[in-house]
Structures are given as C-alpha cells and as structure tokens.
Amino acid sequence: MDYELLKRLDPEVFEAIANETRRQTETLELIASENFTSTAVMEACGSVMTNKYAEGYPGKRYYGGCEFVDVAENLARDRAKKLFGCEYVNVQPHSGSSANMAVLFAVLKPGDSIMGLDLSHGGHLTHGSKVNFSGQFFDAHSYGVDKETGIIDMNAVEEMALKVKPKLIITGASAYSQGFDFKAFREIADKVGAFLMADIAHPAGLVAAGLSANPVPHCHFVTTTTHKTLRGPRGGMIMMGKDFENPMGITVNTKNGPRVKMMSEVIDAEVMPGIQGGPLMHIIAGKAVAFGEALQPEFKAYAQQIKDNAAAMAAKFLAADYHIVSGGTKNHLMLLDLRNKNVNGKVAENLLHDAGITVNKNMVPFDDKSPFVTSGIRVGTPAMTTRGMKVAEAEKIVEFIDRVISAANDDNVADVCKQVRAEVRELCLQFPLNGYGLQV
C-alpha cells in the first residue's frame, strides 16, 4: 500500500506503521488469534466507507445516503450465510466480545446463571470470567478439562448443568486444541432448559471450510470474530441456523396488535441500539471481501494446510519432550505446558520475541502461576500458513523454538536468540507476504 502522503504529513505515525510492517515481514507470527488479511480486505477497510454513519440496518437506517453501504452490508450477510449455512447473520458487532455481549444481554437478565469453559482451562474472558462483564452481570459457573487428559469432561459438564440450571451454556475457547461436541452440549442444554451459544472465534475459518464441526445445526446462537482463521478484518458476527420466536415473550406492537418478536429482531435490537450505535461500515465492507475470499476453493486448501502445519508442529514438539495440553491438536493451535522445561511462559515469550518469534504466554489448566507469569505458551499456525509455509517449515519452526527454550537458563541464551533471529529472518524472507498484509 502507498503511504507517501502519510509519510509526508505525519512522519511519526508513518514510522510506527513502517516498523510494524518490518516486524510482520521479518519475524514469525505464531499468536493463534492473529493472521494477515489480503490487500483487498485492507483496501476495503481503508475506503471512503469509513466516512459514513449508518445507524440501523439495510433498508431501515436512521440516516440518509446509505444506499451503497447497504450493498456492502448485504453482501457480507449473504456471503456469511452461505459460508456457515445459517438463516440469520448480524455483521455489525465491532468485536467478538461485542457479539457475545449482545447475545448475553438479549437472552439473560442480571443475576441469571451461565456456564462456560474456565478461562485458565482455555476459555475466554466473555464466557464468565469474574473480571469481565459476563462474570459481573451474571452468576457464572465454569466447567473445565480433565486433569489427566486435558480434555473437557462432558459428564462433569452435565452434572454441573443439572445442579446450576443455567439459562445459557457457552461452548468455545481461546486456548483449547480439541473440538467441541455440539450435539452433546445441546442435549445437556435441552435437559436443563438452557440456551446454547457457540463462540467459534478461533476455528471459524476451519468451520467455514468444512474442516471443523459446524455448531450452527445444534446451537441457538453462534458468535465469532472475523479475523483469526477466517482471515478478515478485526470484528465480530452473530449467527443463527434458524430464526425462532423469542421464548422470553418480548413483543412488538403492530397495526394488528402486539406480536412476539422473532429472535433475530431481539438480537438486532441488542446490537443496535442496545450496545452499539453506528456500525463500522468500512470494516463491514472488509468483512464482505474476506467472506468472498473464504468462499473460494483456495481457502479450503489454506484451511487444510493450517491443520496440517499444526499437526506437524504438535508431533515435533511431542518428540522433543514438550507437554501439549490435551495431548495434541485437532485445530490451528496448541498449548504448551513448559513446567518440565524449567521455564515459565513469561520468560519463554520474551526470549522467543528476542529470537524473532511471536507467541503469547498462557495459563495452563490447574496452573500454579499467575496470569502475568503463567506456565505455558500458546502457539498457532494461521499467520505462518498465510505466508505459504508448509509442514517442512512448521517442523523447522519447532526446532527454532526448542533451541531457545533449551537455552533459557544458559549463560549463552542471548547468543542463541540472536542466531535464531537471523535464521528466522532468512526463512521469513523466503516467504514474503505476497499481497497479504503490508508491503515494505
């Protein structure tokens, strides 16, 4: 992208962007929630649609002059419906957290009980964490993974649900490398009269490609981000497989008298005006472009390579005596418990950063360290796969990581990081972004 005007008018901001461009170009991005969008997506996000207010929904705006942003939003909605096989889509949430907030506020009252995967077991802040709105407005209960297997214990989930009688059960995770049995979760939800929501922010691209279980047929609500494995701009989305009359009895007055609102109407109203005002139309345009890209055959090949690369990395880590929580991966990420390597997550993250490899420290189940230190790191393959890297490179990256971790307590660790960084840069330059992300 051409930044000549920015360089001349605001050299300080330009310098920050140039340095970030260099970082993305010359280092390895292994944070599981990050990816590189296409240049086409960035062009849409940087378009004149950033200038337009469009409160409301296509055909029902509170402002005039929305005929062309309506086209973009309808394209995003229609393409998302085709991608995920759903009847209802709202593409206006600014983030995955906003999408989750809208659903929770739509179907719950303050103090209602919810269930979600424990944050320290791989869940997400918005699934009931006490430091988040979801754990402050609602009576949150957390299910977890089995201490031995690292896999969600469905019997324990059912036992908790029967005891707690939640109004909403949330599936989904931010650091769980296995899949979710949505059918089993729905059976539990039906037993206790709960809504079921799947947050597929992480595997959404794999779901869209048909390479991970689709929750749409089983869940009342499905939320996601639009970046991560879906490779779009940063944003959120809400879906329903089938629309239905809201069971809370919320009505709307019509010329024929009151009628029960459809759930889609309740969700739409909770997004806007409930928690948001004007949607980000430039980002929604970017979402439309990304969804169009995800509908192409090449995207399925990309998603398969994400999984292949992750599986290869997991096998290589296990062979090098690393402990992967749950024993392996069925998606795009893995959570490494580093306690047997005598290094904590914070130290590992910092050393790998010095070596040109970006990961994030992450708590592991039953962790005895604080969230600011942690016992593990999370590693993901979406961004490296976007660069065109395959299994051979995935295995080489594990070797890079192992060299750094193995030297963590040695006097020469700085020299090791410096050498690895040079090799990482050389590898990255062999796989330029090629139209994905910023160009230097």
UniProtKB/Swiss-Prot annotation:
Alphabetical UniProt keywords: Amino-acid biosynthesis, Cytoplasm, One-carbon metabolism, Pyridoxal phosphate, Transferase
In-chain residues carrying the UniProt-annotated modification N6-(pyridoxal phosphate)lysine: K228
Site feature location: Plays an important role in substrate specificity: H227
A GO cellular component entry from the record: cytosol
Enzyme Commission designation: 2.1.2.1
NCBIfam families in the cross-refs: PRK00011.1 (NF000586)
Name of the protein in question: Serine hydroxymethyltransferase
Organism: Chlorobaculum parvum (strain DSM 263 / NCIMB 8327) (Chlorobium vibrioforme subsp. thiosulfatophilum)
Designated gene of the protein: glyA
